[in-house]
A protein has these predicted regions:
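Hydrophobic membrane-insertion alpha-helices, especially the h-region
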Residues: 1-12
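A secondary-structure boundary/capping signal
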Residues: 99-100, 137, 167
C-alpha cells in the first residue's frame, strides 16, 4: 500500500504541475530590520520605519511578480507594512488591528492582495462605513511577539477591534 500511495502522489504532482514551496531567492531586507538593541522588549523582529525592500523568487509561473521575479514591500512610519496612517483615527472610522506573522504581513503577496487590505475593502462595502485595517505583523513573529508588540505599541493605535490570526507554527 505504501508503494501504491507513492505512485498516486507522483501522478497527482505531475498532473497538477506541483513544484513545491519556493522560498525567496534573495532576502534583501537586512537593511530594513532594526538592530537588536532597538527592538521593543520581548519582540523578535521589527522593521525600520519608512523603508522599502524587495524579495525575489526563483520562478514566476503565474506572472504575479515583477520582471525580476520580485516583490517590493513598503514599511510605513510605524515600522509596519502598508501605507502611513494617522495615529488618531477619523471620527466614524472602525479601526481594526490585524495581528499576526508572515501570513498577515503578506510575504509573497502584493499589498492589495494581503488579508488586511482584502478585509478592509470587504468590510467597508458591507458595513457602508469607513474601515481601517492595520497590518500589525512581521514574518517570524510568534504569539509572544504579537502580545509584546500589542501591549507596548499596538494599543496606542486605539483600535476598536484586535484580530489575531493564529497559525499553528505561532504557538509558543
Amino acid at each position: 500500500s505504501l508503494l501504491c500511495t507513492l505512485v498516486c502522489l507522483e501522478v497527482v504532482f505531475r498532473v497538477f504541475d506541483w513544484r513545491g514551496y519556493h522560498a525567496p531567492r534573495t532576502r534583501d531586507w537586512g537593511h530594513a530590520l532594526l538592530p537588536e538593541t532597538d527592538l521593543l522588549p520581548g519582540v523578535f523582529r521589527q522593521f525600520v520605519p519608512n523603508t522599502e525592500f524587495e524579495l525575489a523568487y526563483d520562478s514566476n509561473p503565474r506572472g504575479y511578480f515583477d520582471s525580476n521575479n520580485g516583490l517590493r514591500y513598503r514599511i510605513n512610519k510605524f515600522g509596519l507594512r502598508g501605507p502611513d496612517f494617522a495615529l488618531e483615527k477619523e471620527a466614524g472610522t472602525l479601526r481594526i488591528v490585524l495581528l499576526g506573522d508572515s501570513f498577515v504581513f503578506g510575504e509573497g503577496v502584493k499589498w492589495q492582495d494581503t488579508l488586511g487590505e482584502q478585509l478592509e475593502v470587504a468590510l467597508s462595502a458591507k458595513l457602508d462605513r469607513s474601515v481601517e485595517v492595520l497590518n500589525v505583523a512581521v514574518g517570524g513573529w510568534s504569539t509572544v511577539d504579537e502580545i509584546a508588540y500589542l501591549s507596548q505599541r499596538g494599543l496606542h493605535f486605539k483600535p476598536d477591534l484586535v484580530l489575531v490570526v493564529y497559525v499553528l507554527n505561532d504557538a509558543e
